[in-house]
Amino acid sequence: MKKLITANDIREAHARGEQAMSVVLRASIITPEAREVADLLGFTITECDESIPVTASVPASVPADKTESQRIRETIIAQLPEGQFTESLVAQLMEKVMKEKQSLEQGAMQPSFKSVTGKGGIKVIDGSSVKFGRFDGAEPHCVGLTDLVTGDDGSSMAAGFMQWENAFFPWTLNYDEIDMVLEGELHVRHEGQTMIAKAGDVMFIPKGSSIEFGTTSSVKFLYVAWPANWQSL
């Protein structure tokens, strides 16, 4: 049976101080999540065995309308010896990959950041340290959100970062909000009109607005909301 190279294998190797791993494709299966984690950690996976054509280890492009499970299944089958695997083996490998992917996504979507709070409650957040959580109000889209200043800081306002790619979702604001776009474009649809703010622009959205937040490309912005408990209103 082929050895399955998982994201945990990459993490463990990286924790040992290793920067690269050589993998014999004829005897191994590298999960998509393992490759993703390797990219995030700057870890190099070297695929050995030049006797196997590149097309044997790199599956053909998959149409966008295929489900995620179909894409994972085809990736696994492409790395198994032709005619030498069973459906039960494929199902077993798919289950392991899906669990690994879910674990990776949950770990990757935990909000965090570094900050220093000085005398009198003055707080400085290290913007480069911010890791995004997932905004439940935008499901099923993957919208990142991290609160940086909240009522826990003794503030009557809240502030944080949001970011996502190529998605729109409806939202009703029961609070006032000001957004400053840091990257990309923020689109707000309201009463048949679309307002667009680009990097460096500031947008005000008054309380009571029923809108669609979105972007046709990508966006990252700083939001300031009043009152601080805007998510529970």
Swiss-Prot record:
This protein's superkingdom? Bacteria
What Enzyme Commission number(s) apply to this enzyme?
2.7.2.1
Where, if anywhere, are coiled coils annotated?
A: none
**Predominant place of localization:** other
Q: Known InterPro entries for this protein?
A: EutQ, RmlC-like_jellyroll, RmlC_Cupin_sf
- Which reaction(s) does its UniProt entry say it catalyses? acetate + ATP = acetyl phosphate + ADP
Summarizing the function annotation, the protein's role is: A bidirectional acetate kinase that may drive flux through the ethanolamine degradation pathway under anoxic conditions. It may generate ATP that can be used by other enzymes (EutA and EutT) in the eut pathway. Might serve as an assembly hub for bacterial microcompartment (BMC) shell proteins.
The protein's assembly and partners = Homodimer.
Please identify the protein, giving its name as recorded.
Acetate kinase EutQ
Q: Which organism is it from?
A: Escherichia coli (strain K12)
